């Protein structure tokens, strides 16, 4: 999903203006939520049943990297706002989308590392 979001970000043009920011936000947020589910399946089964906001509150303890957990929570919040159309808000800029995308990539890499260590 992250690759698809990155491809959309790199190919955005005037013909798709207004559509691609929300599509990128949806794909990126889904990638973050998938990484959370992967983490909980190994570290704390059952947490995935809680709201994403509650999962993000628990994240620093289980991830082992408080700064990265905060970045993931910040990215999720921004991505969630971007996924919903509000007439009084501008869509996110490509720079914002890229920053959130990079935060999700780092988070997913850390989750893969944590999950891999548990399986060893």
Where are these regions (language model features)?
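Solvent-exposed, well-ordered amphipathic alpha-helical segments
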Residues: 1, 16-18, 33, 38, ...
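Short, mixed-charge, low-aromatic patches
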Residues: 11-14, 30-35, 53-63
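Short, hydrophobic, well-ordered secondary-structure elements
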Residues: 21-41
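Charged alpha-helical initiation segments
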Residues: 1-19, 73, 113-120
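Long, charged low-complexity segments
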Residues: 45-120
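Amphipathic, well-ordered alpha-helical segments in soluble domains
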Residues: 1-4, 27, 34, 75-78, ...
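Secondary-structure edge/capping motif, primarily at the C-terminal ends of alpha-helices
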Residues: 8-16, 38, 42, 83-90
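Conserved aromatic-histidine-acidic binding/catalytic patches
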Residues: 16-24, 28, 67, 92
């Amino acid at each position: 999903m992250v690759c698809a979001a990155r491809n959309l970000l790199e190919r955005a043009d005037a013909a798709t203006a207004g559509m691609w920011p929300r599509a990128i936000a949806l794909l990126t947020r889904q990638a973050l939520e998938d990484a959370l589910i992967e983490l909980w399946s190994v570290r704390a089964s059952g947490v995935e049943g809680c709201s994403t906001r509650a999962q993000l509150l628990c994240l620093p303890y289980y991830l082992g990297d408080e700064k990265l957990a905060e970045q993931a929570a910040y990215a999720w919040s921004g991505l969630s706002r971007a996924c919903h159309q509000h007439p009084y808000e501008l869509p996110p800029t490509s720079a914002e989308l890229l920053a959130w995308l990079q935060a999700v990539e780092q988070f997913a890499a850390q989750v893969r590392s944590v999950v891999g260590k548990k399986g060893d």
